[in-house]
Amino acid sequence: GSMPDYVAKYPVIQTDDERERYKAVFQDQFSEYKELSAEVQAVLRKFDELDAVMSRLPHHSESRQEHERISRIHEEFKKKKNDPTFLEKKERCDYLKNKLSHIKQRIQEYDKVMN
């Protein structure tokens, strides 16, 4: 329930220099966010696809091998989705998203005041 660190770290912008600094941080972390986000989305999308495939599989599948193969892939992705490294990436991704929108908001507020 505590405030995220960036709220205190990025208060209302007072000067053009500050605006420049905020903008630099934004651009720097936006590229990290984009990379992470693409990676995280790919895993989640793949997982959803597999979920759909699994649910469409006939339970008394003619080909047991096919069934087992898809089950195995599904398990792999379940592991990957609950993998601490992946969860960390997902958390970092959400954190960056919120941080970036906070910084962007500060920049927009400053621009409004200045114009």
Predicted region positions:
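Residue-identity detector for glutamine
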Residues: 14, 27-29, 41, 65, ...
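Short, charge-rich amphipathic alpha-helices with coiled-coil/heptad character
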Residues: 2-31
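Eukaryotic short linear interaction motifs
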Residues: 42-45, 57
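Acidic, serine/threonine/proline-rich low-complexity intrinsically disordered regions
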Residues: 4, 8, 50-115
